[in-house]
């Protein structure tokens, strides 16, 4: 069993104003899924992108929107969860005055 605090995990800068912490992955003994903590600073846009795998999101703190090529498609606030299907173009924008934080789960075998 693994029990840690997120502050014990180093942050990786994804782009300016956005960091990612790999909380659980293969090196922690998880064979199937990775759990990541994403933090987006106020006013920052996570550039639209896509992946060949699904991912699941659960919003912890802050406010923002999920975007796709057509514009804003959903509000992000604590308690909201999002399923992003494989290869769907998506991005995020922090619309609040506090960091937007969410858990993002992805499969390790992709």
Region annotations inferred by a language model:
Residues 37, 56, 83, 98-110:
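A short hydrophobic beta-strand segment most commonly corresponding to one strand
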Residues 47-48, 66-67, 84, 89-96:
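Short beta-strand His + acidic residue motifs that chelate non-heme Fe in jelly-roll/DSBH
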Residues 52-53, 72, 88-89, 98:
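A generic "binding-loop/recognition-motif" signal
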Residues 70-86:
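Short acidic-glycine-tyrosine-enriched beta hairpin
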Residues 21, 36-51, 86:
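Conserved short histidine dyad/triad with adjacent acidic residue
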Residues 37-40, 51-66:
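Short, conserved beta-strand element in jelly-roll/cupin
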Residues 28-29, 71, 97-98, 110:
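Short strand-connecting beta-turns/loops that link adjacent beta-strands
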Residues 1-32:
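A short, N-terminal "cap"/entry segment at the start of jelly-roll beta-barrel domains
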């Amino acid at each position: 069993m693994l029990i840690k605090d997120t502050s014990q995990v180093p942050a990786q800068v994804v782009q300016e104003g956005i960091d990612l912490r790999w909380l659980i992955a293969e090196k922690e003994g998880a064979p199937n899924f990775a759990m990541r903590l994403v933090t987006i600073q106020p006013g920052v846009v996570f550039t639209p992108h896509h992946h060949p795998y699904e991912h699941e999101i659960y919003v912890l703190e802050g406010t923002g929107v999920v975007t796709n090529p057509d514009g804003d498609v959903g509000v992000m606030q604590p308690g909201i969860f999002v399923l992003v299907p494989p290869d769907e173009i998506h991005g995020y924008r922090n619309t609040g005055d506090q960091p937007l934080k969410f858990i993002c789960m992805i499969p390790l075998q992709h």
